[in-house]
Amino acid sequence: MDTAQKQRWAITLSYDGSRFYGWQKQAGGVPTVQAALETALARIAGESVATTVAGRTDTGVHAAAQVVHFDITAARPQQAWVRGVNAHLPEGIAVLHARQVAPGFHARFDAYGRHYRYLLESAPVRSPLLKNRAGWTHLKLDIEPMRRAAALLIGEQDFSSFRAAGCQAKSPVKTIYRTDLTQSAGLIRLDLHGNAFLHHMVRNIMGALVYVGSGRLSVEGFAALIQERSRLKAPPTFMPDGLYLTGVDYPGAYGIVRPQIPEWL
């Protein structure tokens, strides 16, 4: 059917990444977020639906506010794309908001900012209640040098030292607008706001910050690591469990509002 007859919708969804093998559809019926979402959307639309996501997430990585767009010919009310779709989604995924958008809107290319949070438990024994919800280290961490190191990430830089080997990004140069590191009740929260992120970038940053907090890497060493622009001397990639995509920024004209981070997170 002529694409001119189609409507473009944008939805914001949340999901528990520990239940899925990442965002992207895979062969062999492997459970992924995209496969589950497109199946549920098709049930409501009465036609096959292809989705485009703001940012793909790996196995075990969560989303508090992921954004997706899709095109459909079927006319459905807004609540059909929220309550209706949720009725057909498996546990671990929920559509939070839906909005019809301009035909030219693109969930990935129109995004000018992305927000991530890494939740880290620092304790001698890992809490079973936080498994799959937070990363963990048995090491006692000093948060002050970690804060100073994280602040060095701000600005436009070449982040090759925090880039996965298989990263498909055209350039390792990204801009970090803000970093924030807090600690309460044994949990450390790292918040990063940037224009875009490389594959495994946040997890690699957290791995290096854990080295800083434990004294295995100085703040000066962290600065040198950034300048090395190489993974060869960098600490290992940290576990995915504590990583959350918490928001995506779009121009106000699209009307897509970034929800607040849940209080429990």
Swiss-Prot record:
Its EC number is 5.4.99.12. Formation of pseudouridine at positions 38, 39 and 40 in the anticodon stem and loop of transfer RNAs. PANTHER family: PSEUDOURIDYLATE SYNTHASE (PTHR11142), TRNA PSEUDOURIDINE SYNTHASE-LIKE 1 (PTHR11142:SF0). Belongs to the tRNA pseudouridine synthase TruA family. Substrate binds at Y116. The active site is at D58. The gene is truA. SUPFAM superfamilies: Pseudouridine synthase. GO terms for molecular function: RNA binding; tRNA pseudouridine(38-40) synthase activity. It is an enzyme of class 5 (isomerase). It comes from Neisseria gonorrhoeae (strain NCCP11945). It comes from the Bacteria. Gene3D superfamilies: Pseudouridine synthase I, catalytic domain, C-terminal subdomain (3.30.70.660), Pseudouridine synthase I, catalytic domain, N-terminal subdomain (3.30.70.580). Homodimer. NCBIfam families: hisT_truA. This is tRNA pseudouridine synthase A. It holds the Pfam family PseudoU_synth_1. InterPro entries: PsdUridine_synth_cat_dom_sf, PsdUridine_synth_TruA, PsdUridine_synth_TruA_a/b_dom, PsdUridine_synth_TruA_C, TruA/RsuA/RluB/E/F_N. Keywords: Isomerase, tRNA processing. GO terms for biological process: tRNA pseudouridine synthesis. HAMAP family: TruA. It catalyses: uridine(38/39/40) in tRNA = pseudouridine(38/39/40) in tRNA.
